[in-house]
Every structure is written in structure tokens, then in C-alpha cells.
From Swiss-Prot:
GO terms for biological process: regulation of translational fidelity; tRNA threonylcarbamoyladenosine modification. It catalyses: L-threonine + hydrogencarbonate + ATP = L-threonylcarbamoyladenylate + diphosphate + H2O. The keyword Transferase applies. Its EC number is 2.7.7.87. It comes from Citrobacter koseri (strain ATCC BAA-895 / CDC 4225-83 / SGSC4696). This is Threonylcarbamoyl-AMP synthase. One of its GO terms (molecular function) is tRNA binding. Residues 7-190 form the YrdC-like domain. GO terms for cellular component: cytoplasm. Required for the formation of a threonylcarbamoyl group on adenosine at position 37 (t(6)A37) in tRNAs that read codons beginning with adenine. Catalyzes the conversion of L-threonine, HCO(3)(-)/CO(2) and ATP to give threonylcarbamoyl-AMP (TC-AMP) as the acyladenylate intermediate, with the release of diphosphate. InterPro entries: DHBP_synth_RibB-like_a/b_dom, Sua5-like_dom, TC-AMP_synthase, TC-AMP_synthase_SUA5.
Length: 190
């Protein structure tokens, strides 16, 4: 699988993100749709596209832990908890962290926490590095339809002109596992 994204494709995707628009891209298991987490306009576009209520909260996907630190509060983690998290990252495990009051409600929804993941998908790593921050990430599918696993499925659901970063998913059958960062409680099996 070759997920090395050409520089021009990265630049094109970053340009779309800077316009506060939503893009689709392959992740570990399915295609995701994402946008700039700091843009309420972009997040509202994503929520409208997905017909997803803001109260549900969202997931951020990043190239590294440093990109996530402005959005989460990791001060209560013990060394053991930190080791358990970093043993899973980068990889397809999402952790729910407490969120500081500065994290926008359009990301956290009705929660005082935020779900985050450091991806090991090389294309998404390249995209987040080029953009300089994490992306909001949720499965690429319209309400009631299965998540897209190919570029063709994304275009069939979202339209031929929807901005898609072409590439292959990581081949996982299930979406990421979701766990509480402080307790390790499993919220969703991966």
C-alpha cells in the first residue's frame, strides 16, 4: 500500500482546509471526513453534512501528541496511565481526555471531555503535519448509509466534486477502539 501523498495533493487538501471546508481522506479502517477543529464554520459544515447533532461531540485525529495538547487536559494522568496510552499510539485507539474550558463546545458537545487519536496512517500523518494541527475526524457516510471504504464510495455518497484525498484505508475491519484515558474503560470495541 502506497499512501505517500504527493506534495501537490497535500497542498491542495491544506488549501481546502484553510477555506473552512470539509475534506474526505482514508484512515485506518474507513474514509473519514474532517475539517479544521478551530473553525466553528468548518465544524458546522461537517455537522450539517453528516446530519450529526453538535451535542454528540467529535474526535480529533493527529500526527502526534503535541498537536492534541491544546485541546485536552492531561495533567491528571499518572505515569502508568500515560504509558498505557502511548503504548497504543500511534494507532487505531481513541482516548477520551478531560477537556479544558478553552476547548470549543463545537468539539466537545455536551461533554467536558474530548476524544482524540494519534494516527498511524501515513497519509493522515502527512496531512496533519502539513496543516500543522489535528483534524476533526468522523466516518465518511451520510446518515443511514455504511461508512465509505473507497474513493468511489465517498464520491457516490457526497458527490463527484467533494474534495477527497485519494489513498487506501489501512485495511482494518472495525473503526477505532474508544477508551477513557483516566480509567481505561472501554466505550467502543475496535
Amino acid at each position: 500500500m502506497n499512501n505517500n501523498l504527493p506534495t501537490d495533493a497535500i497542498a491542495a487538501a491544506v488549501a481546502v482546509l484553510h477555506k473552512e471546508c470539509v475534506i474526505a481522506y482514508p484512515t485506518e479502517a474507513v474514509f473519514g471526513v474532517g475539517c479544521d477543529p478551530d473553525s466553528e464554520t468548518a465544524v458546522n459544515r461537517l455537522l450539517e453534512l453528516k446530519q450529526r447533532p453538535v451535542e454528540k461531540g467529535l474526535i480529533l485525529i493527529a500526527a502526534n501528541f503535541e498537536q492534541l495538547k491544546p485541546y485536552i487536559d492531561d495533567s491528571m494522568l499518572t505515569d502508568t496511565q500515560r504509558e498505557a496510552i502511548f503504548a497504543c499510539w500511534p494507532g487505531p485507539v481513541t482516548f477520551v481526555f478531560p477537556a479544558p474550558a478553552t476547548t470549543p463546545r463545537w468539539l466537545t458537545g455536551r461533554f467536558d471531555s474530548l476524544a482524540v487519536r494519534v494516527t498511524d496512517h501515513p497519509l493522515v500523518v502527512s496531512l496533519c503535519q502539513a496543516y500543522g494541527k489535528p483534524l476533526v475526524s468522523t466516518s465518511a457516510n451520510l446518515t443511514g448509509l455504511p461508512p465509505c471504504r473507497t474513493v468511489e464510495e465517498v464520491r457516490a455518497q457526497f458527490g463527484a466534486d467533494f474534495p477527497v484525498v485519494e489513498g487506501e484505508t489501512g485495511g482494518r475491519l472495525n473503526p477505532s477502539e474508544i477508551r477513557d484515558a483516566l480509567t481505561g474503560e472501554l466505550f467502543r470495541q475496535g
